Amino acid sequence: QCNLCVRACREVQSNDVIGMANRGHQTKIVFDFDAAMGNSTCVACGECVQACPTGALIEDSLLNEQGVRTEYEDRTVKTLCPFCGVGCQTNVHIKDDKILYVEGRDGPANNSRLCVKGRFGFDYAHHPDRLKVPLIRRDGTPKNPEVNISQNEIKTYFREATWEEALDRAALGLKNISDKDPGTSIAGFGSAKCSNEEAYLFQKLIRQGFVTNNVDHCTRLCHASSVAALMEGLSSGAVTAPFKAAEDADCIIVIGARPAENHPVAATYLKNAAKNGAELIVMDPRGQSQGIARYASH
């Protein structure tokens, strides 16, 4: 056995799930103490799959009913994982405009690592209810926010349109509102799902396009307390070091956070550091018995 899957689980993700059992010709790869994968402590990050050089471990989405790989990509797109703010870089392998599988790419935030969401959480992109073209409300259709429109009723209330028509319609409507009361009738509220570049363009649209400073972002509310604490303690409300810097730290303090659940790739660096001798202190008013607390000294 090459043991790459064991090393990926232990040394990269620090999950310590995959190991070797028995001796001699009976030696084999096991999960925990020879438990079935589904009953083990495996978090399905897929690091072992990416590390496997032979195809002994492979994504189920590539196999047919007989367990034979029949799907091969026709192109690969370099992008970022959309699930959280860690910024993991990915290679998305595509065939006929359908995602086949995702691999971690060597970037400063993840060093080719991914979590279960980043590697396997892409089925929403092909959900039959996903809107694929712009829709415009049909003339005369009543507007009622209390009415829940099912997928089968969408064409009753909306019609398909081109991007040009939809953008022109939206721009005209926003312009009419802005012209009625310039500077005060329009406000922009940004989303945490947007990248920094998208957030910059959004505020630029509000400030320059509609000539108003009525722009805000949801993270100002949820991170106001942490920013204030950072300003007082470090004289900076922004991040001062990447997660990977944990590898060089002697002591790491995690306060009120659950990185193993919410930012699993970031948590790998904390777990790596703890296994290499760093002091990991976890403070959480909700309490933690699993996750990052398993690796904490206090």
Regions found by a protein language model. Give the residues of each.
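N-terminal export/assembly segments and adjacent metallocofactor-ligating motifs
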Residues: 1-298
